[in-house]
Amino acid sequence: MMYQRLILTFLLFFSVNVFSQSKDQILGKWLNASGEAHIQIYLNGSKYFGKIAWMKTPNNPDGSPRLDKNNPNSSLSSNSILGLVILKDFVFNDNIWQGGSIYDPKTGKTYSCKISLQGPDKINVRGFVGFSMLGRTESWTRVK
């Protein structure tokens, strides 16, 4: 009887630890799916944000920095893509970072987004319009 309780306690403890995630596990640098950029995810107040911290090709062929030329807000189109905040306003809820948005500097479009942890070094980033079923998911890996 005591042996069964010990096993049950162990299994209960183990299952809770496996399925619970710390809200700050997402913090750090992540390599995007294309391998073109590192995104630094950080906490600002109670929300999570992400900015482009490194780019494989940060400059144009003429040596000038790549700019956010496709931004629909003309006052922002002269900003450098390096350092650009592309993930905004995420909150942690039910093991998912949600309620935020992702900006794509290649198209100048912003999408609703949610992020889920797939392991200590992998996240799935899902951008969508309207319903999350209508979107695209990318896997990002942690930069070590």
Predicted stretch roles:
Residues 1-7:
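Bacterial N-terminal signal peptides that target proteins for export
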Residues 27, 35, 42-103, 110-111:
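Central antiparallel beta-sheet cores of small beta-barrel/beta-sandwich binding domains
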Residues 32-34, 102-106, 127-131:
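Short acidic, glycine-rich loop/turn motifs
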Residues 19-29:
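N-terminal helix-cap/turn-to-beta initiation motif at the start of protein domains
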Residues 43, 92, 117-118, 142:
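Generic beta-strand structural signal
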Residues 15-17:
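N-terminal signal peptide c-region/cleavage motif recognized by signal peptidases
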Residues 104-120, 125-126:
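Acidic, glycine-rich flexible loop segments
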Residues 120-122, 130-144:
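Edge beta-strand at a domain terminus
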